[in-house]
């Protein structure tokens, strides 16, 4: 049966959103909306948050606080442009957005939507988790609460967002200039990730890596930090032996499953390969801090 068309409200004043959300559901880009409605998720009234985007920039940088504030309601294209145009430097997130779905989807999809769907395969979440992001949430009474992204993610399709609440922005400490993102999917675009990896670190003058932070998607109920592997790399030169040790440490932090997209065995193999390529890019490829176009792999190897 065809779902009944919902009522759509599009406020332009943040003060109106909490009132309108009573008995309604918030949407932004709506790129996952039709999929969910076909699966039986009904909402008689939708509150479109994209009308709030005109009131503020997509990305702002607070040099004094040393952090970036990223709008949850601007399209991903605007976020990438804001980062590229000098509002801040966040190479892992920029690379993730460039590999996200397709141009058409990026012109609609938002950071907020990618977060609240709670998908362990979400492409923007690893970069945000690796950066230590905090989520700013507007409560039903118009107040504001902040929760660490690691605590916001509760499980597959489950996040710490109560009825009547909505995500307004994401704040991250200013990331280092060296970072990146890689994903493996069934094709180069319009594909859910079999696996993805985001990383960031400082490279000291002697080549040692410090402030190493790694996060991976599609290997656990939520996107997870690879803390054990990061600890192996911390303050080390990324020699072959060190990289081998870091790759071997990945298993301590992941728990992949078999599903329709890939097997657990395949995901473990890919996890090792993605980290190895981030640290020791094959000759003739982009450096680890540059964008990397995903490649198609045999998912059942």
Describe the predicted segments one by one:
Residues 1-301:
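C-terminal structural segment of proteins
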